[in-house]
Amino acid sequence: MSRLKVTETFVSIQGEADAVGWPTLFIRLTGCPLRCVYCDTQYSFYGGEWRTLDELLVVARESSVRHVCVAGGEPLAQKACLELLTALCDSGYSVSLETSGALDVARVDPRVSRVVDLKTPESGEGKRNMLANLDVLTSHDQLKFVLCSRADYEWARDLLRERAEPLPAQVLFSPAWGQVEPRDLADWILADRLPVRLQVQLHKYLWGSEPGR
């Protein structure tokens, strides 16, 4: 039986991406090869407890919610993450995966909504992006940019404009917490008429940076 190292499981309101606002079970896996400057889950880098797939499916069943988000850290850093995602889909859950743009997402079960967080220059990890991931995203997925400054915004805007074909995935622009004002980002998007969604971290407006919320 495959096992995964898990930092925490909890039910909260999904604060980001397409399922924002829904009661959601979060399964936060341990470990991440990246060190983004704005990371708000550094506590997931180390520690954690080993859990079997069956144990995590029991957690999902007992949560009594239909949305499950597998997050990290970087969940794809654990090979058994792919098995977990498929098992959750097979059990009838609406499943999303929060992942960086640094690891291959092509093997993720197509029933999963992949939320790919492409790293900007000021994240400190922009050189780790696997840009080939953009070519496998579908309308079921989301591409997220967490923006630390006007320069980050312009980088993301130009990357999108330079593509020969528009991305089928939804594109989300999110202000880095405490670094870019949401109102400023909204003004930039409107001024450029960008076909992107403004995203704020709803859970932080509700509960701040409290772990497990």
Predicted regions and their residues:
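Homeobox/homeodomain signature
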Residues: 3, 17, 22, 58, ...
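Conserved Radical SAM active-site core
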Residues: 4-11, 23-26, 34-113
